[in-house]
């Protein structure tokens, strides 16, 4: 009875076991590595990814290719997750991760065919990994400022033409140096730098600007468009009379009743804006809308206001100015206000943009230019990779020789170390060393 129920439950399930399952998993890893192998190296090729809706992405970035690929095999999905983890940790080495994992699986498959138990292979790989990490630490060197710049440039090799990679390496290094004093966590550099795209100009006309830049203009042209320092308030909500959230009807029994409702609305707005004026607010940023009646009141009090900000922009503005994000204007206190050092509007590609420079924290905006969306998006990816590497390099200034030299050295070191192991783990350590040699081979091909 139990066997019958299990049979019905697995009726539509394909089950692989034994050698067949191992071969299937290794083939999936090899296919994934083969799809991105040609992107690695100074002459690596770009990939064009075409979505179901016809849109396309042209990129040399391994993790971008993998995350946009339509993959069903569970082993391939696991490798893509490993590549994404590598990207979050180091902002580089995503393609290398897949190639190494694929080679290690193929070498492990050969050992299994020779009769080596998988647990022995896992133990041998673990020993080899620990030894490789210790040896890598031993041969690492502090690069100095010039060496850091060269390391960032090396990380971008093959992601674009020489001039583009040189340009974004310098831009990324400059941004990382400005952020260096504040430390930060894993995604610190991504959160502190906003990215905007502009169709006017070439990619080499891109620029890094201090402060938060948004394609916004003040809600009234009579409001000050340039303020040299002041107080800012951030409202996560709206500055208008909210509609009732329940179904209700109101009976008007006198000619002045409707007017009284309107006057009450105006009185509430006047009270809120008066509260801001008493606090000395110079700049008001609102996530949602601002009522037309409120605009005139803000103008009369000399408060410059902006509306319809995205949540990430509010958070970055909060960081660089020290302002707390409030949900109720009447509850804003002096301690909730932030300081900005400069505010002005600038026309970029015939569109007015607002620039707010904070005085509490470092925040920047990179303006990536290009004639097509594909070029601009790839420029942003190149900058992001360079910034991630530069930020981590400043925090942990150790580098290894490039061009596959470090992998070749570690491979030789592990082969020598394996001779000191008297058990069957020696075979797995040698297989690990052989897998490391795949990177110099691919670089020689590309």
Predicted region positions:
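Core, soluble structural subunits of large cytosolic macromolecular machines
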Residues: 1-446
């Amino acid at each position: 009875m139990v066997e019958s129920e299990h049979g019905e439950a697995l009726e539509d399930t394909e089950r692989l076991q034994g050698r067949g399952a191992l071969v299937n998993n290794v083939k999936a890893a090899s296919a994934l590595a083969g799809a991105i192998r040609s992107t690695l190296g100074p002459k690596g090729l770009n990939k064009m990814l075409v979505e179901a809706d016809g849109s396309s992405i042209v990129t040399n970035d391994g993790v971008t290719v993998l995350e946009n690929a339509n993959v069903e095999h569970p082993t391939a999905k696991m490798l893509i997750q490993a590549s994404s983890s590598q990207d979050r940790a180091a902002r580089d080495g995503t393609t290398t991760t897949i190639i190494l994992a694929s080679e290690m699986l193929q070498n492990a498959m050969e050992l299994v065919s020779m009769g080596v138990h998988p647990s022995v292979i896992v133990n041998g790989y673990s020993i080899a990994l620990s030894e490789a990490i210790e040896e890598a630490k031993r041969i690492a060197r502090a690069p100095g400022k010039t060496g850091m710049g060269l390391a960032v440039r090396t990380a971008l090799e093959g992601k674009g033409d020489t001039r583009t990679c040189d340009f974004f390496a310098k831009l990324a290094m400059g941004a990382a140096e400005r952020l260096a004093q504040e430390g930060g966590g894993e995604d610190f550099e991504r959160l502190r730098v906003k990215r905007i795209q502009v169709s006017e100009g070439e990619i080499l006309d891109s620029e890094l600007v201090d402060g938060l830049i948004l394609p916004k203009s003040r809600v009234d042209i009579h409001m000050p468009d340039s303020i040299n320092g002041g107080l800012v308030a951030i409202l996560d909500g709206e500055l208008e009379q909210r509609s009732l959230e329940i179904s209700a009807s109101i009976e008007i029994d006198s000619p002045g009743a409707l007017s009284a409702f309107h006057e009450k609305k105006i009185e509430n707005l006047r009270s809120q804006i008066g509260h801001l004026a008493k606090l000395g607010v110079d700049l008001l940023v609102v996530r949602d809308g601002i009522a037309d009646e409120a605009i005139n009141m803000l103008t009369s009090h000399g408060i410059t206001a902006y509306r319809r900000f995205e949540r990430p922009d509010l958070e970055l503005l909060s960081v660089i100015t020290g302002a707390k994000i409030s949900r109720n204007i009447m509850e804003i206190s002096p301690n909730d206000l932030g300081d900005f050092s400069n505010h002005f509007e600038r026309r970029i590609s015939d569109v007015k943009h607002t620039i707010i420079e904070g005085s509490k924290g470092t925040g920047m905006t990179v303006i990536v230019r290009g004639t097509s969306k594909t070029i601009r998006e790839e420029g942003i990816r190149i900058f992001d990779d360079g910034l991630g590497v530069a930020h981590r390099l400043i925090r942990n200034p150790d580098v290894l020789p490039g061009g596959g030299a470090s992998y070749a050295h570690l491979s030789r070191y592990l082969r020598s170390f394996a001779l000191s192991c008297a058990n069957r783990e020696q075979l797995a350590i040698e297989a690990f060393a052989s897998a490391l040699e795949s990177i110099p081979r691919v670089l020689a091909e590309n």
